[in-house]
Amino acid sequence: MSWGYLEDASGIKGHADRICVPKNESELVAELAEASGQQAPVTVAGGGSGLTGGRVPFGGWLISMEKFRRLDLDSGKARVGAGITLHELHAAAKIGGQFYPPDPTETMAFMGGTIACNSSGSRSFMYGATRRWIERLRVALPSGEILDVHRGDAIDFDVPEIPQPAARKHSCGYPLRPGMDWIDLFTGAEGTLGIVLEAEVRLLPTPRELLNGIIFFPSDEVALDALDAWRSVTGLRMLEYVDDPALRMIAQRYPDVPETAKAALIIEQIMEGDRDIDAWVDRLAETGAFEEKSWFGTSDADRERFRKFRHALPETALDISVRNGFTSLGTDFSVPIEKNREMLAFYRKHMDRIMPGHYCIFGHVGDGHPHVNMLPATQAEFDAGSDVLTVFARQCVQLGASVAAEHGLGKRKAKFLPIQYSTVHIEPMKAVKR
C-alpha cells in the first residue's frame, strides 16, 4: 500500500504549505535554513507506514526523505540512507549471509522512520529494539547543522535522569539518563531533535537453520500457559500471540486455520539439530496444543508463508477499519511480562462493553506487548474506542508499562505523554529540545 505525502497508514490526513523532496544533504540543509528563517514548522516524512500520524503535516513544510538511498554492506554492518526500506536492507543482507535483527512487521517502512520510532517487531523477543543495533548516525539539526555521531560519543551537556517504566519495550519521550550517548538520544525521538540522514547498523550472520511454527490451541488460557512455559526455550527468537477473533478475521485468507482453534502462538527458533523438532513435539503434548493441526517448517518458503500470515493480521484489521470508514484505532502499550494476563483481561473487559465482537488482539505477548486492534462499525463505537485508549494508558502506567512501545506517539498519541511522565519529568525533555 502507498500513501501520499499528506497521510499515513493511520488514515489521518493533513495539509502542508510546501512539500520538499531534497535529493541530497545540501538541498536539505538549505530547505531547513529557509524554513527556520520563515519560522515555518517542519514535518519529516518517511515511508508513510506509521500508525500515529507522525509524518502527517498540519501546516508548515513537509520534507520527504525518499531520495536518501545509500545502501552499502560490509561484514557485520550496513550503511543505510533514511529512505532505504526495511525490505531492501533485509534482502541485501541476505545475499551476503547476514541479517538485520530488528524486524518491524511493515517491511516497506523507511529505515529513517524505524530509527525515529525505535521500532522493534516480532524478533525483539531475542534481539530487542532498533536502538541496540545502531553504531553511527548522521543527523541534520533544525538549524541545518550536521552531526555525525558514533556509539559511545558522550553528550556535551548535563543529562538528568528520568524514571523509565519496567516494561521491556519503551519508545515514549526521551529516555534521559546520565551517561547516555547521542545515539541513545536521537533514536526514538521521532524526528523532534533532528532528521536522521543515514545510519550505520550492525548485522549478524544468518543462522544455519531456523524452525518456524504456528501452533494452535483449544483455548486462550492454554495458549497463555504455553507462552509462560516456552519463554525460556533456548534459541527462541519469536513468541507471538493471536487470539480467536484475529484467527476468525483472517480465516477467509487462510482457510486451513483449524475451526476449533481459539488461539495461536507464532514461534521461530534457531535450530541446533533434529532434537529441537522432537522437543517441540513433546512441548505440544505437554501443553495441550493441537499436535496434528499446528504448522511447522524449516525452509525459506515456509518462513515466508508464516511471515505473510503474521503480516496479514494488521493488514486485514486496517482494511476493515478503512472499509468501515474509520482510521486505524489500536494500542501500542507494553507491560511487564508478569502483568500480561492482567492487562489482557482489562482490555477485554472494556472492549466487550464498548465494541463487542468488533476487536481482536495479537502481537508481541512474549514481550508483554499485545496490540488491541479495534474494528468499529459505527461512529459511536469509534468515539468510545478513542476514549477508552486513555483508560488503557492510565492502567498500563499503573502496572509499570509504556504507553508507546514501538510506534511512537506521533500526533495521535501525544496526549499520552503526560500520562507516562509528570510535568517535573517532561520539563527536562523540553529543555533538551530547546
Map each language-model feature to its residues.
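C-terminal substrate-recognition/cap domain of FAD-linked oxidoreductases
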Residues: S2, T187-A189, I195, V201-V391, ...
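N-terminal flexible segment immediately upstream of the FAD-binding catalytic core
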Residues: M1-Q39, V44-K77, Y127, E200-L203, ...
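Glycine-rich tight-turn/loop motif centered on a GG-T
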Residues: D17-V21, K77, G330-D332, L375-S386, ...
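FAD-binding subdomain of flavoenzyme oxidoreductases
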Residues: R70-D74, A82, L86-H87, A91-G235
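N-terminal accessory segments
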Residues: M1-H15, G37-V42, G47, L284-F306, ...
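Activity-critical C-terminal alpha-helical subdomain
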Residues: A414-R434
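A glycine- and small-aliphatic-rich helix-loop capping segment at beta-alpha/alpha-beta transitions
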Residues: G54-R69, K94-Q98, S120-R131, V201-P205, ...
